[in-house]
């Protein structure tokens, strides 16, 4: 797959040895370290990058997830789960700070 973001290409050109080591680590973790099927691994990466607000990674993970066979419905459902898993807890923490100040 081609690089989705010019900054990634720039990083690879400026730091080829670090890039190669990062690629090796990523391959080891993604492909060789556990029993999860490929589609589930990409679905997890999509959810993690979205929850972490890493939009460049999210775009890449969606593309690779689609290549692994994820449907738009599966990806959309995973992202929808952010509302309760990320959004509501963030609200509750902010609300607790607000209430504590009164």
List PLM regions with ranges.
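Acidic, glycine/proline-rich low-complexity segments that act as flexible tails and inter-domain linkers
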Residues: 1-40, 93-102
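C-terminal structural segments of small proteins and small subunits
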Residues: 72-99
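Residues within well-ordered alpha-helical secondary structure of globular protein domains
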Residues: 24, 47, 81-84
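Residues at alpha-helix boundaries and short interhelical turns
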Residues: 12, 34, 51-55, 69, ...
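Amphipathic, charged-and-aliphatic alpha-helical interface segments
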Residues: 41-55
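Mid-chain, well-packed structural core segment of small domains
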Residues: 53-79
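General structural signal for alpha-helix termini and helix-helix connectors
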Residues: 28-31, 67, 81
């Amino acid at each position: 797959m081609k690089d989705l973001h010019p900054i990634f290409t720039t990083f690879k050109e400026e730091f080829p040895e670090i890039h190669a080591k990062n690629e090796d680590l990523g391959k080891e973790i993604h492909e060789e370290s556990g029993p999860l099927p490929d589609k589930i691994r990409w679905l997890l990466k999509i959810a993690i990058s979205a929850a972490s607000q890493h939009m460049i990674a999210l775009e890449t993970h969606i593309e690779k997830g689609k290549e692994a066979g994820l449907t738009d419905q599966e990806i959309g459902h995973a992202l929808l789960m952010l509302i309760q898993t990320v959004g509501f807890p963030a609200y509750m923490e902010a609300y607790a700070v607000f209430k504590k100040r009164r």
